[in-house]
Amino acid sequence: MDITNANSVVSLMNSVLAPSSKVGSLDGSAGDNAKVSIDFGAVLKSSLDKVDASQQKAETLSRSFELGNNDVDLHDVMLSLQKANIDLQTAVQVRNKLVSAYQNIMSMSI
């Protein structure tokens, strides 16, 4: 997933969530008027930043190994590449579910 595609998904979700920004805080019943504030856009952006960081780490390790750096082992490179792949596939599946949910909501009649 290209970072520009990820940014477009984030901007799409922010535009969808903008009208319902008042719903972002939940009253918790566990404490004395405890409030939990959840910003979905920030959580999504943070997750995408983590995916990007794992991709960058895997690319850096791979490049170091290709250039003959003795501090980088092949198994470290392969593990980081697989972790980055799993992170990316997870992000793609989350995106697919979000788009599907958005399409379901948009097709509902009022």
Swiss-Prot record:
Record's GO cellular component, any one?
bacterial-type flagellum basal body
Q: Which InterPro entries match?
A: FliE
State the disulfide connectivity: none
For this protein, the parts annotated as crossing the membrane are none
Name a single GO biological process: bacterial-type flagellum-dependent cell motility
| Short name of any one Pfam family annotated for the protein | FliE
Q: Which UniProt keywords apply?
A: Bacterial flagellum, Plasmid
- Record GO terms (molecular function): cytoskeletal motor activity; structural molecule activity
Q: What is the annotated localization of this protein?
A: Bacterial flagellum basal body
Q: What is the top-level taxon of the source organism?
A: Bacteria
Zinc keyword on record: no
Keyword Magnesium on entry: no
- NCBIfam families per the UniProt record, alphabetical: fliE
**Which family does the record claim for this protein?**
Belongs to the FliE family.
What is the designated name of this protein?
A: Flagellar hook-basal body complex protein FliE
By which gene is this protein encoded?
fliE
